[in-house]
Amino acid sequence: MNNFLKVSLLAAAVAVSLTACQKDEKTAANTAEVKAEASKPAEAPKAEAKSFEEQSGYAIGLSMGRYIANTLERQQELGIKLDNSVILKGVTDGLGKEAKMTDEEIQKVLQQYDAKINELTKAKADKDAVENQKKGEEYLAANAKKEGVKSTESGLQYQVEKMGTGAKPKATDIVKVHYTGTLTDGTKFDSSVDRGEPATFPLNQVIPGWTEGVQLMPVGSKFKFFLPSKLAYGEHGAGSIPANAVLVFDVELLAIEKPAADGDNAKK
C-alpha cells in the first residue's frame, strides 16, 4: 500500500477539520471583540498564550493540512475529488474504534485509488506531451521566419544579440557562462543570473542544443537559443520542464576555462 496515500487521507481530514475549527474560532473571537469594545473603553487584555502541546499540535496539523491541500488540488485536476465530510467520518470512526471497513478492505481500496491516480497521471502526461510537441513545432516554424533568427541542420535556432571577439570553444572545452532558461510562454525555470554566479561545465556534458549552440559563440558573445525538444529534454522532460517542450536560453559566453592540472586534481 502506498504510504503517501495513508498520509494523504489523514492529513486531508486534518486540513478540513482545521479549516472548520478556524472558522468557528474566528467567529467566536469576533463576537468577543465586539462585546469587549462595547463594555471597556480601554484596550482589551491580551489572550493567554496557548500551551506548548496546543501550539505543537496545531503547527503539525496546519503544516500537514497545507501540504495535503496542494496534493488534493493537483488530484482534482485529474478529475478526482474526495468528499471532505466522508474523509472526516473515516477519521472519526478510526479514532473511535468503529471502523466500517476491515484492514483488508482498506488496503484494497487504497491500492485501487493509487492505481487510478497513476493511470490518470499517465494519461494526462501523454496528452500534454502530444500537445507540447504540436505547439513546439508551430512555435519553431513561426520563429524561424523572424528577422535575425538562424537555423542549423539539427533544427537548433539562434539569434545573435552581441558578437564577441574571442575564441570559439570546442565540444571538449570547459566553458563559463551566464544564462537564463525559459519555456516558450516566458516561464523561467533556471537562471545563473538570478543566482548571481556563472555556471562552469564541460560543453560535451550538457544537453545537445547547448553543446552545438555554444560552439557557435566567440567568447564575449550573447546569443538567444531556441531548442527543439529533441535537442533538450525530449519526451521525458525534467523537473518543471514538460515533456516535448521547446526551450529558450539567453546565453553569454564569459570564458573558456583551462582544465585542472593532474596535480590539482590529485589534491582535491
From Swiss-Prot:
* Main localization, broad class: periplasm
Q: What EC number(s) is this enzyme filed under?
A: 5.2.1.8
A Pfam family found in this protein is FKBP_C
UniProt keyword Signal, yes or no: yes
> What span is annotated as the signal peptide, if there is one?
1-20
Gene3D superfamilies according to UniProt? 3.10.50.40, Peptidyl-prolyl cis-trans isomerase, FKBP-type, N-terminal domain
Q: Which residues form the PPIase FKBP-type domain?
A: 172-257
Q: Where in or outside the cell?
A: Periplasm
Keywords in alphabetical order: Isomerase, Periplasm, Rotamase, Signal
Instruction: Spell out the NCBIfam families in the cross-references.
Output: PRK10902.1
> What's the family?
Belongs to the FKBP-type PPIase family.
Chain's role:
PPIases accelerate the folding of proteins. It catalyzes the cis-trans isomerization of proline imidic peptide bonds in oligopeptides. FkpA probably acts in the folding of extracytoplasmic proteins.
List the protein's name: FKBP-type peptidyl-prolyl cis-trans isomerase FkpA
Q: Which organism is it from?
A: Aeromonas hydrophila
